[in-house]
Amino acid sequence: MLLAVGLYSCTEDPLFEERARVAEGLPARVMLDFRSEKSCVETRAAQDATYENRVNNLYVFIFNPAGEVHYRNFFTDDISYNGDYSKGSVMIETTSLNKVQIVCIANLSTESVSSGYDVKKSDMESITSRSDLEAFVMKMDEHTVERSTQFMMTGYAYDDKNSTSNLVNIPGTESGPASLECTLRPERTDARVEFVVKTEKPSDKNWTALDFRPRGWRVVNV
């Protein structure tokens, strides 16, 4: 499944109530920050952290409380990075709305980006609701444990004051651009594994040297 991050829309955290409701339907030009999350799960071959967390492009959905698409856009050259390619911001032009969910998909396949998954902008353009996105299945270009240096990521925007709430209010910005009080947190959809093979001299042997040379290897049930 493409959208594997859990939903929290069934219940509202009390902290969310502190966010004042906004007048809906007003023009909104808002800055949305993103920061790729470092995954603790390790089930595939490792790459340098520079590549593990790099965001090359970003497709952003905003879903209204009914799960319908309120806004969508594919960001490529118009991403503002902050220090490195794992964090930055994008400018969103939409209309004000309460209790939306903002979802991102990073590193879609383009002429310059290849993550090993055959997911393109056209696939995202066919999405009409949050349930469509949740049902979308990513397909790998090839079945291998080797990984490229570009990785598919998905994630929600979470409230900056309540890291468990993915419900966001988008304010109108008649007086000028504003920053949303939330952060997109894309995470890799794959994982990595590290196999550590150690050899030790048996305690009951008097070996002076030990040479271990595997002739091959195979990974199953990853």
Show where each model-derived region lies:
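Bacterial N-terminal signal peptides
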Residues: 1-6
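Sec-type signal peptide cleavage vicinity
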Residues: 7-222
